[in-house]
Amino acid sequence: MNTDKEIKRIALEMCPNYCYGTPYYLNTRTDRMRRDRQLPACLHIQTSEGSESTTATPYWQTDVRTRRVQVGFADAIKFDDDPEKTLEKVEELLSMCRELIKRMNASNLWARINEFSYNVLYNTQDGNLVWVLMDFNATELPRNCED
């Protein structure tokens, strides 16, 4: 299986009641947020410590030309709230990314990654969203893979 598709599969396993095919994503031409369909109000996240509920949504994007994969989680947040709440939300998304890395390691996917970084993105124009994204350079990402 392609590295990017395997990473996406693991991210979706963490969100068993996630409605497949409706991730948040950035349109690279307009750099604006959009959604295909209505997303579930709450996701049930399975972690190694147990399960918990969250409103976070999986996100991914594959750039076939550069062989980079972005995967992570997005969530709506009110930026006029207490800054501590914003930090708590970012930490929640980071913990979900850490869980994803654990699962990637268990699936021997980490060996296929030769470059890695975290990005925290905020979007106040399109509904007050925060993303925590992991940016990978996947060595085995074929030139003809699909998003």
Model regions and ranges:
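Small/polar-rich, solvent-exposed N-terminal microdomains that initiate assembly or binding
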Residues: 1-61
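Acidic-leaning, charged glycine-interspersed low-complexity segments
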Residues: 15-21, 37-38, 42-44, 90-139
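Alpha-helical context
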Residues: 47-49, 69, 76, 80, ...
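Short, cysteine-centered beta-strand-loop-beta hairpins and adjacent loop/turn segments enriched
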Residues: 52-54, 76-81, 141-147
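Phosphate-binding glycine-rich loops and adjacent basic patches that engage nucleotide phosphates
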Residues: 56-68, 97-98
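Residues at structural and domain junctions
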Residues: 57, 83-86, 122
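Oligomerization/assembly interface segments of phage tail-like spikes and tubes
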Residues: 62-78, 128-142
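Short histidine-centered catalytic/ligand-binding loop motif
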Residues: 79-93
